[in-house]
Amino acid sequence: MAPRGRGGNFRGRGGRGRGRGGRGRGRATSRFGPNRRFDGARLADNDESESSGSEAESAPEDEVMGDVDSDADDDDEDEQSSKPYMALLQSFTENNAPKAKRRKLEHQEAQGQPEESSDDEKADEEEEEKDIDRAEEDPEDQDAEEQIEDDDDSEDEDNLTDPFDTHFAHPDDDTVAKRVKAVQKGEWATKRALIQNLRATVTYPSSDAGSEVPKPMAGPDGLSLKQKLKETAARKIGEFDAAQRAFSPLLFNYSDVLHCDRTVRNSDSLRKLTCLHALNHVFKTRDRVIKNNYKLAKEGQDTELELRDQGFTRPKVLFLLPTRNSCLRIVNIIRDLCEPDQQENRKRFEEGYVDKEAKFGDDRPADFRDLFEGSDDDMFRLGMKFTRKTIKYFSQFYNSDILFASPLGLRMAIGSEEDKKLDFDFLSSIEMVVVDQADALLMQNWEHVEFIFEHLNLQPKDAHGCDFSRVRNWYLEDWAKHFRQTVILSAFNTPELSELLRLHCHNWAGKVRLQPEYPGSLSQLGVKLKQTFSRFRSSSVDKDPDARFEYFTSAIVPSLAKRAKDATGTLIFIPSYLDFVRVRNYFATSSAVENVTFGAISEYADVPEASRARSHFLNGRHRVLLYTERAHHFRRYQLRGVQRVIFYGLPDNPIFYNEIAGGYLSKSEQDMRLEPGQGSVKVVFSKYDVMKLERIVGSKRVGKMIQERGDTFEFI
């Protein structure tokens, strides 16, 4: 396995899919002083006076982020006992006194103190002012406004046909026990089906005789929604489109879903449906608690009535999102579906999340604009609280119903393992997780996503005012992870997403993977060229990087070095940054390629560096250009002068293959730098690249290319 990246540095870039770094826009600096430069380029004109021509980027040390203020308890609790309920009660008997919240305490003390303040206090105040996501303190009687009102919205009473009741509120104990036992033993059964032209792989606990594949739904009328949401859904969403018809029965049935066909075109439809489901879950949970409060109040203190309707903490839904703009879209959909009378802190929210400046023209691809338009900041977190008539933004996490965050933002809120100030109790009762644009999160630091999932649904260290007589039994049994629904929306599947589904999705309702039948990108390049796919042998995933490098240096490099003068215009595309460093070092130090001039553009290259490399590549001073996938993801450079492309590895995103293999070579033909039909593409792949390969060559071809005895495949 690739390394997990640096332990304490949140923006670290490790191996492929394990320690991806931050957004890659700009150049970071080392906390140990200036970065030492690596000679990662070679110019054709050796007496060139520009020293910058021989410079190349080196991976900078990670930027250390500032401390984030939270309500974390600093005590280092012991590990959980094998008997979760008893261990939980024992941990709370040690210290049941509520902890004083930091900002409230400081505010009260300040009233009786002189006006003078220390430098540290001023620094803390300045830090809080800079933190635009700082949560506001709620009054102690935070739920006082939630008075019982007589209304006709009583359709959420116990309903055996409502998935909310059958999955969360009143599940069948025997059925759940059998399925949870099967899940804990890793006993799963699989069924395959076709849903609206999407291939569905349904996995369910093997204790079942068989799990039916839900049929597509035509519209919101078939859903068990709160009456108010049913009315707004009919107006705001209407009849379902094809994407919603396939997605809705899986989503509202509380199955885990890995949806691998999220596109720019259907993204809004999927977002609306997901937000509707999240709101429905929050409203049903909240109203059930309020009505039970009323029942208990009528019965009095001596009642034996047992109403278990809660978790340990209030937050029920978590959205993991790549940028502030993606958060803005989700929040606006929730607001439109909710139609609140009041929105508390809405102006502050818009100041922090709305960026009306148009940054990109139509020359940028649609998927690029969809991701990076608006505020593309990947450091944020937001709590949202609902009352009957109000939405409150920036509520404290422990008083929130829905949490929105980037992986980095939530990781910072949880805290650092090094200083033992971790606070993740607010994740203990999350019942629905939505990971939107997961393919974009893969280009950030995926380790943060893994860290968050590792800390979901753990039993809390502190009581946080919890009434344990109201906590559902399956929380006390430490089964919360078996009830949580996880929804992952991605443009495509990757090994990281499949592993996330395997390791962290233990839903007793089962899980479903949806993905399309891929026609392939080979015939969609818009230019005639020779495409050669060469398969190399690799004995395991761990040894794949070494086998790939060995094949590249023994089978690809010799022909490149032999015809060094004819190598002008060779672009080498490298998906992994670790592989990029290895290849760059080889070109810089190996005698086998000492006659080959080269340049490099990675995600760490700043604008001047990248501009020099592009210019030298265009005029031939760099005959070879090394180019990473993340650099292309964040910049989408329009490289000119490309005459042949070597894919050291295939990109995850099939759009990148079209843009690089088709777009760059087509541009060279238009610029009359390349004779029509003379461009070439060479791809290096192994059997472990099957997911990437399928999207490029098509679902029908991929099996033969992986399994046939021959190892070379040509397409013209």
Curated annotation (Swiss-Prot):
Keyword rRNA processing: yes
Biological-process GO terms, alphabetical: maturation of SSU-rRNA from tricistronic rRNA transcript (SSU-rRNA, 5.8S rRNA, LSU-rRNA)
Family per similarity comment: Belongs to the UTP25 family.
Keywords: Nucleus, Ribonucleoprotein, Ribosome biogenesis, rRNA processing
Gene name in the database record: UTP25
Listed Basic residues bias regions: 13-28
Superkingdom of origin: Eukaryota
Designated name of the protein: U3 small nucleolar RNA-associated protein 25
Main location class: nucleus
